[in-house]
Regions:
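NTP-binding/hydrolysis catalytic cores, primarily Walker-type P-loop NTPases
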Residues: 321-364
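Beta-strand-loop-alpha "switch" segments that mediate conformational coupling across diverse proteins
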Residues: 286-330, 337
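Extreme N-terminal, non-catalytic leader segments
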Residues: 27-112
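Phosphate-binding/switch loop-helix module in NTP-utilizing enzymes
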Residues: 187-238
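Compositionally biased, intrinsically disordered low-complexity segments enriched
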Residues: 2-26
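Conserved catalytic-core segment of NTP-binding enzymes
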Residues: 214-215, 225-307
């Protein structure tokens, strides 16, 4: 992410099979120039009008963003680094994560993020993943909002206005389009990634299954990494995304109830296909500063079928809502986001745990 000891690692070059046209880095929330490709289908589709993500009257409601950690905690960590040797170990861990995040892909990797209920932090985790991949990878990164009714991905990514939605794009997308055609219908977010909103914030807006399939199939060859913020389960698009993507992330509150519900989802996934669990990652999201479960025991319970289980610590900045500003995240949160992105990419590339080692063994 933009802050953190990542200088020892340089981003890898994108592979030839994935479009190497790198994303621009315009200011957050700025609508790019709409480059209309000359296709007959686009001429039949009316151009949507840009609408704000949040109504103007709510501008003053959002409190000033806070740092993810208190001043005392940050000062304590600085002192420990002065008198201990943990800094080198932390740098090594981040470097390992960066290598995993940056590993080359031969075809686009699509990563689904879902949860069993609203309020688990699904859109927040999707935003963290999208920001992390956009920061570390040199090839194009896309975030797709597949939860148009209740998702908050555009807001979390700092987008101020939305225009084209997934439904709009599905009506005009054409196999002959280049990535430079497509980005005219997308929104840039901090770090160089692109966002495809699910709607213009309309109540009752839905993304039907056919539209989802058209969008995901059409965009895969242009984007090396796609993070999909799905509806909560058991919605049809969410179930389809969990089965058809290369890796899946289940976000659950770090509570006993959340663990129990997520265990049921994992059992369902294992019944659909035994190969789904080794490519699944469960995020235990701490939404309060007081931990309510034993993370180690919860990981043992949820990981029995092969899924990875990673904690996301409580962070004041994330808990406050609004756009995720990576410079305000607590250090533990940045490290957790990097570990999560690395684990998800490993499993998406290798279709299971221990990915790079297993792939290397096959090639040898």
């Amino acid at each position: 992410m933009p802050t953190g000891p990542v200088s020892p690692v340089s981003p890898v070059s994108p592979v030839s099979s994935v479009s190497s046209v790198g994303p621009a880095t315009p200011a957050p929330g700025v609508q790019p120039h709409i480059h209309q490709p000359h296709h007959s289908s686009s001429a039949l589709t009316p151009t949507p009008v840009s609408v704000p993500v949040l109504p103007p009257e709510l501008d003053d409601v959002q409190a000033k963003p806070r740092h993810g950690e208190t001043v005392a905690r940050r000062a304590g960590r600085a002192l420990r680094r002065v008198f201990a040797s943990s800094a080198a170990a932390e740098t090594e861990a981040v470097t390992r994560a960066a290598h995993a995040i940056q590993q080359p892909v031969t075809t686009g990797r699509q990563l689904a993020v879902s949860s069993i209920r609203g309020g688990a932090g699904k859109s927040t985790v999707a935003a963290l993943l999208a920001l992390t991949y956009a920061h570390y990878r040199a090839d194009p990164v896309l975030a797709v909002e597949a939860d148009p009714a209740l998702g908050t991905l555009p807001h979390r990514l700092g987008v101020r206005e939305v225009r084209w939605s997934g439904t709009d794009l599905a009506q005009i997308v054409d196999p002959s389009m280049l990535i430079t055609d497509l980005t005219g219908y997308l929104l840039p977010f901090t770090g160089g990634g692109w966002l495809l909103p699910g709607s213009q914030g309309s109540i009752g807006a839905r993304l039907d299954l056919d539209t989802y399939r058209i969008v995901m199939t059409s965009l895969r060859r242009h984007f090396a990494t796609t993070v999909v913020d799905c509806e909560t389960l058991p919605a049809e698009v969410a179930r389809t995304a969990l089965v058809t993507t290369q890796a899946r992330v289940l976000v659950t509150p770090a509570t006993v109830e959340g663990v129990r519900a997520t265990k049921s989802v994992l059992e369902w996934m294992g019944g659909v296909h035994r190969g789904l669990l080794p490519t699944a990652v469960v995020v235990l999201n701490h939404t309060s500063p007081d931990g309510g479960i034993d993370v180690r025991k919860a990981a043992e319970h949820l990981g029995a079928g092969g899924a990875a289980v990673l904690p996301l610590p409580y962070d004041r900045h994330l808990a406050g809502g609004g756009a995720v500003r990576t410079e305000l995240l607590g250090e533990r949160t940045r490290e957790a986001a990097a570990r999560l992105a690395a684990e998800v990419m490993d499993r998406a590339v290798s279709r299971g745990p221990g990915g790079r080692q297993r792939e290397g063994a096959r090639e040898g």
